[in-house]
Amino acid sequence: MLRSALLAGAAFALLPGTAFAQAQDATPTPVADDGAGGTAAPADATAADAPPAQGDDRRAPESQDIVVTGSRIRGPDLLAGTTAITGEELTRDVRPSIGETLQHLPGVSASSFGPNASRPVLRGFQGERVSILTDGIGSLDVSSTSADHAVAINPLTADRIDVLRGPTALLYGTSAIGGVVNVLDSRIPRRVPTDHVHIDGILTYGSAANERSGNAAADLPVGGNFVVHVDGNYSQTDDMDIGGYALAPALRAQALASADPAIRALADIRGTLPNSAAKTWDIAAGAAWISGENNVGFSINHYDSLYGVPIRYSLDPAIDAEAPRLDIAQTRIDGRAEIDTGTGFLDSIQLRGGYSDYRHFELEQSGAIGTRFDSTGYEGRAEFVQSTRQGWGGGFGAQYFHRDFAVAGAEKFLPDNSTNQLGLFALETLDRGAFKGEASVRYEHTAYDADADPIIGNPALTRNFNAFSAALGAQYTVAPGWRIGLNASRTERAPSVEELFANGPHGGTQSFEIGDPGIDLEKSWGIEATIRGAGEGYTLGASVFHSWFNGYIYETPTGAIQDDLPVFQYFQANARYYGFELEGSVKVARIGNFDINLDGVGDYVHATIAGSGPAPRIPPLRLLGGIEAQSDRINGRVEVEWVADQNRIAAFETPTDGYTMVNASLSFRPFHDNRSSIVLSANNIFDVDARRHASFLKDYAPLSGRDLRISARFTF
């Protein structure tokens, strides 16, 4: 108790003067083209804007004018800003899942359905309300279908990962109420290497799960304008070490009180999380023709993963707990073309498309296939980027998505179905010096067709939805380096296939899921106020947001048991979300060649569903403070993360204890070109028992215990 109190105090002590974490969009430094799909933004930094600290790779800087990754449409990104991780931060934080890789960013938590299936949670939103993309189009998997389904994007392949919010998110769909996560890689090259061959790689070892992983990629110029790309990666983990018992304290007390010896034995599971091992491999090849701003290319890749889902233990001796494993395979083909149209109304045209053949098996403990998921789909988008004239800019485009989805097996919970979706979008911007404005609109038509299915007892069903969304934003520079913003949005989201048609046992989530075919559009209003500032040696940022929902769709346990599984059912009601994010950094000293910086992050979400009380799985208040010593070749960092108790819970939820976690890292760039680095890190140094309230499995699967890691990234 004393140690937790001291550590929590340390977290607060690091925050004064930096109570707003590194609001890098307050430092309008242009984002350089890294060859990963990020196009350099216009360099419009003012003299008052603080330069980044020497050797600082903690957070990729943002610009007041950005180019949204995967899109050439420029916008001032007013509503909430873009956060990007790359370089050493990505090397240090990369994990087997996207959610765990991003969980230190402001406003970001993770669904933590075990270490292998963890999606980002943005401002309390997860699942269908967070879009996960690769280079601007969807992952084309079924990860949003259920919390146990992993995203078929390996973070090891990423050159940069961006988190987008605000009007720019409407470029990618009306469902991205929480935001968009865009993973950038170089599988379709965007530049011709200046060397005979360009090679990137990363090797990682982590002690908590005996993690062994590696990725290597090569770009080879062929002739004057052609580039060939190949990459491959492999990762393997054992069952993950944890900082205490597998069962949360309340469940463990119930297990200890049981008269059944087998149930009492569950209370003794500690130190290791059973059924959490994984093995993943991924290979890809691509090629592109590149001439100035014009390029056309394609890639093909195959992703394969076998991983365990932590066991949801039953304290009823009559019910056997399952230890499911998922076997995922996806073959994907992607294409991209960018055409510089020169002068005139249009500046450029970008075409992007992808096709995916995906399947996964949910395996019983015996190895038999319990359920099979098959998804074949394709997505295409075209963007027409306007030339900037007299401060006006922007663009417009169209997007189409099709998916055929089938579930088969003893635990089938969805009928065979198809989805067709057409989206039309536009983003317009205005730059008048101190004043900048932005407006975006999107129309989206979604059609679902579900087959009649006697197994789950539903007739043939067809639903059509027409959703219209719009967002407005304005910012004003009140002083050199300081700007305020006010933004508003109106969004409509079509329900997902699962929210409409689910009706049956789902072995992966160890629950019985029930949808509602009568669910209507989910509609919301949102407003946000921001302040960003930067000066010599500091950055500062804060935002407060409030969203009102009409017909909010949510899944919650009912307390009933069916087929020996807890029943989770989808409902619709009005709801309200509000919260804040704080971010900042300050340079406090220079000792020799080292800049000493303090930084901090704080975030909080409060969510209520009308007639039901608190929304389920909402992350509690979090504060994170760090001290970092930075030089041209060596960086050292110690940080303390304090997470509050979550006692504001939905029906049938249990409270979640808070925790205080200490992490440290040391990075070294051995060569003068600073293109390669070695990172040593120690996470959860004191081996605390930590659980995320956003996780369906938080009472059965805590976070990783002490994890000592070494990563080496090389480029030549």
Protein language model features and the residues they cover:
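Short, acidic, small-residue-rich periplasmic hinge/interaction motif at the N-terminus
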Residues: 25-91, 99, 127
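Short acidic/polar hinge/loop motifs at secondary-structure boundaries
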Residues: 138-167
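Flexible loop and strand-edge segments within Gram-negative outer membrane beta-barrel domains
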Residues: 274-280, 293-349, 355-377, 410-418, ...
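Outer-membrane beta-barrel signature, preferentially recognizing the C-terminal barrel domain
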Residues: 315-317, 321-336, 340-342, 460-477, ...
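Gram-negative outer-membrane beta-barrel transporters
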Residues: 394, 435, 539-549, 566-646
